[in-house]
Amino acid sequence: MSKPDRYVSFVGIDGDSNARKLVALLRRHIDDPARTNRFWELFKDKLEKINKPDETSGFSQDELYLVHAYINNIRELFETYDDQPALALLDRIEAESC
């Protein structure tokens, strides 16, 4: 199978699944009291509101949306802790889905 072209179609790209995997990698860091801060605590609140539009003024958020919206913050965290597998997945998501 050829490499999917995000500018033509998202066929063959599982952005939602990749974003959920990335959030799981992110949670390993931000759920650690020594690595979290006010920003990440607020981010976790956003994660708790996924697929709850009644709590987000009618706007349905998902993991992929949050990854895209906070990609630079997420990248900085992974770079800080030299999390190479997470950075590789983040690069893939950025290339395929952003």
Curated annotation (Swiss-Prot):
GO biological process, one term: nitrogen fixation
Keywords, alphabetical: Nitrogen fixation
Keyword Ion transport assigned: no
Family statement drawn from the similarity comment of this UniProt entry: Belongs to the CowN family.
Protein role: Is required to sustain N(2)-dependent growth in the presence of low levels of carbon monoxide (CO). Probably acts by protecting the N(2) fixation ability of the nitrogenase complex, which is inactivated in the presence of CO.
HAMAP family noted in UniProt: CowN
Protein name per its UniProtKB record: N(2)-fixation sustaining protein CowN
Organism, scientific name: Trichlorobacter lovleyi (strain ATCC BAA-1151 / DSM 17278 / SZ) (Geobacter lovleyi)
